[in-house]
């Protein structure tokens, strides 16, 4: 939130720790941003919620309106079309389907999106997605693996981690080796359900 607040024509309202924002917070910051660009936009009083799929746009809309006006789900493409909802007098909030870049040249960005569920598991092999997450956890957040799985990260790599996780969770395949797809699903489900705790897959530039 602090990083985005420093960018031009941008504001960071939510950091994942502090209390949830209100409708008045949204409108007030919108007014401030509009005054920096084009004050004629104040007449329209429309705020669009847009972003990548499965990031919580509809959840935010439901929270702000204090009722379930948008369908939510733990998968991309739940929202199919635009929806206009009254926020405050003279102000409307528009929910939109998630949007992705036509092509992601940066493969690490693609994997980070896939880990969160923004890109469907059918687009990238689930084992590859989980492998990326395991390597990131071992490098950046080894304490998460220790806390959840009692696993001490080392230089033995992701394959050793999946073997140990398979033994722990009973996802052993033929030959006594880890069933990689089943074990990958376990890791991804734990991450997506918040069982690994709160942490970022990407850090702001320094």
Predicted regions and their residues:
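Short, structured loop/turn "capping" segments at alpha-beta junctions
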Residues: 37-41, 62, 68-74, 140-145
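Glycine-rich phosphate-binding P-loop
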Residues: 47-66, 96
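Glycine-rich, phosphate-binding/catalytic loops in enzymes
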Residues: 3, 66, 109-113
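Helix-rich effector regions associated with P-loop NTPase G domains
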Residues: 9-19, 73-206
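Alpha-helical scaffold segments in soluble metabolic enzymes
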Residues: 25, 29, 59, 132, ...
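Canonical P-loop GTPase G-domain recognition
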Residues: 1-51, 69, 170-171
């Amino acid at each position: 939130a602090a990083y985005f607040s420093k960018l031009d024509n941008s504001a960071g309202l939510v950091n994942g720790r502090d209390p949830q924002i209100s409708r008045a917070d949204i409108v007030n910051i919108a007014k401030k941003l509009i005054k920096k660009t084009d004050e004629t936009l104040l007449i329209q009083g429309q705020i669009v919620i847009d972003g990548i799929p499965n990031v919580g746009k509809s959840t935010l809309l439901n929270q702000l309106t204090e009722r379930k006006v948008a369908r939510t789900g733990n998968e991309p493409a739940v929202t199919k079309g635009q929806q206009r909802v009254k926020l405050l007098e003279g102000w409307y909030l528009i929910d939109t389907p998630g949007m992705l870049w036509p092509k992601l040249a940066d493969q690490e960005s693609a994997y980070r999106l896939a880990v969160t569920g923004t890109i469907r598991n059918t687009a990238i092999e689930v084992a590859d997605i989980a492998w990326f997450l395991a390597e990131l956890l071992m490098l950046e957040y080894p304490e998460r693996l220790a806390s959840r799985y009692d696993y001490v990260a080392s230089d033995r790599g992701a394959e050793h981690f999946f073997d140990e996780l398979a033994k722990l969770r009973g996802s052993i395949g033929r030959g006594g080796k880890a069933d990689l797809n089943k074990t990958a699903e376990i890791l991804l489900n734990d991450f997506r359900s918040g069982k690994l705790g709160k942490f970022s897959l990407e850090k702001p530039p320094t």
